C-alpha cells in the first residue's frame, strides 16, 4: 500500500512538488554521464497528475534511456494516454490492489482517482492502443496478496484479470514501507534480515522538493516515501549526483547497511527480509532482485561488505 495513502499521512509538505522540465533534464543529463539506462517517472507522487508528462518522457528518450512509470492510472486514458505512448513510453504499470470490487475499494482507497471498473477500462484501452499502433510500450499490472492465508484464492482471481486483459503482471506478498504501514492483518513476512542492496546499487532516487528550500532531494530508494525528511542524502540543486553518491551521508548509509545498524527509516522495511517467496507469481521475464530495464541484480549488492 502506497504511503501517500491518507491513512498513513502521505508525503511531507516540502515534497508535494512537481519537478520543472529544466530541472528534470538537468538531472537526467547528469545521470546520463554515468551510464543511465532507465528513468522511472513516479518517485514523488502520482505521475499522471503531471499534465506535461509526455514532455518528460521525451526528455528521457532524448538521452537514450527507457521511460518507466508505476502508477494507479489516475489520468492514464484518452488523449493523455495516447500522447504518453506516442512520446516513447517503454513500460507502464498499473497498481491494482484488490482482486474484486470490494477488495479494491478497501486497499486502494482511491474512490476519486479510480475504481475496479475504471481501472479495468483504462488497462484495456491502453493495451489496445499499444497493439493498434504497434508501439513498444509494455502494459503491466501489479497486485498484492492481501491475506497470506488465502494466497491461492487471491492468486486465481488476479490471474483471471491478467489473462482477460492480456497484460504482463507481478503478484507480490504485501510489504510495509519503512515502517509507515501496519500490515499485520495480511500476514507478516518472516526471514533473516540483511541489507537490501540498494545503497550499493546504481539506483538513484531524485525527488521533487527537498529540505530548507532546496530541490532534487536524493533518497536511498523509493520505499522511503512517507519518511521523506529523514532519508535525504543530498540535493541536486546543490551538488552533482557523483558528489552526493560519494558524500558523507550516502557513505554512512552504506556503512550502516554493512554493520546491520540500520537507520530508522530502513530498520523496519520488509526489503531487508530474506523471503524467497515474496514474489508470488509473474508472467513477465523478471527475477525477484532484478530491477526492471536494468542490467544489475540486487542480489549481488545484498552480499556487499
Model feature map: region roles:
Residues 1-91, 106-111, 117, 273-305:
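Conserved alpha-helical substructure of the radical SAM core
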Residues 5-11, 102, 186-188, 194:
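Short glycine/proline- and charge-enriched loop/turn segments
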Amino acid at each position: 500500500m502506497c504511503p501517500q495513502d491518507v491513512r498513513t499521512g502521505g508525503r511531507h509538505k516540502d515534497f508535494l512538488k512537481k519537478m520543472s522540465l529544466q530541472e528534470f533534464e538537468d538531472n537526467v543529463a547528469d545521470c546520463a554521464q554515468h551510464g543511465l539506462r532507465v528513468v522511472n517517472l513516479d518517485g514523488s507522487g502520482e505521475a499522471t497528475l503531471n499534465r506535461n508528462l509526455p514532455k518528460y518522457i521525451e526528455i528521457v528518450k532524448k538521452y537514450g534511456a527507457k521511460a518507466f512509470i508505476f502508477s494507479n492510472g489516475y489520468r492514464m486514458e484518452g488523449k493523455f494516454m495516447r500522447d504518453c505512448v506516442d512520446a516513447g513510453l517503454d513500460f507502464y504499470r498499473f497498481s491494482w490492489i484488490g482482486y474484486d470490487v470490494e477488495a479494491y475499494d478497501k486497499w486502494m482507497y482511491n474512490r476519486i482517482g479510480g475504481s475496479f471498473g475504471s481501472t479495468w477500462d483504462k488497462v484495456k484501452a491502453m493495451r489496445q492502443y499499444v497493439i493498434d499502433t504497434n508501439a513498444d510500450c509494455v502494459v503491466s499490472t501489479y497486485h498484492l496478496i492481501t491475506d497470506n492465508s488465502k494466497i491461492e484464492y487471491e492468486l486465481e482471481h488476479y490471474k483471471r484479470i491478467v489473462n482477460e486483459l492480456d497484460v504482463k503482471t507481478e503478484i507480490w506478498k504485501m510489504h510495509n514501507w519503512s515502517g509507515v504501514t501496519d500490515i499485520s492483518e495480511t500476514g507478516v513476512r518472516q526471514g533473516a534480515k540483511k541489507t537490501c542492496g540498494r545503497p550499493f546499487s546504481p539506483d538513484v532516487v531524485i525527488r521533487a522538493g527537498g529540505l530548507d528550500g532546496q530541490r532534487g532531494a536524493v533518497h536511498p530508494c523509493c520505499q522511503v516515501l512517507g519518511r521523506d525528511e529523514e532519508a535525504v542524502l543530498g540535493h541536486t540543486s546543490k551538488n552533482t549526483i557523483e558528489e552526493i553518491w560519494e558524500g558523507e551521508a550516502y557513505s554512512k548509509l552504506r556503512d550502516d547497511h554493512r554493520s546491520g545498524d540500520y537507520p530508522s527509516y530502513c530498520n523496519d522495511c520488509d526489503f531487508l527480509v530474506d523471503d524467497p517467496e515474496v514474489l508470488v507469481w509473474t508472467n513477465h521475464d523478471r527475477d525477484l532482485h532484478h530491477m526492471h530495464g536494468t542490467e544489475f541484480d540486487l542480489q549481488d549488492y545484498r552480499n556487499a561488505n
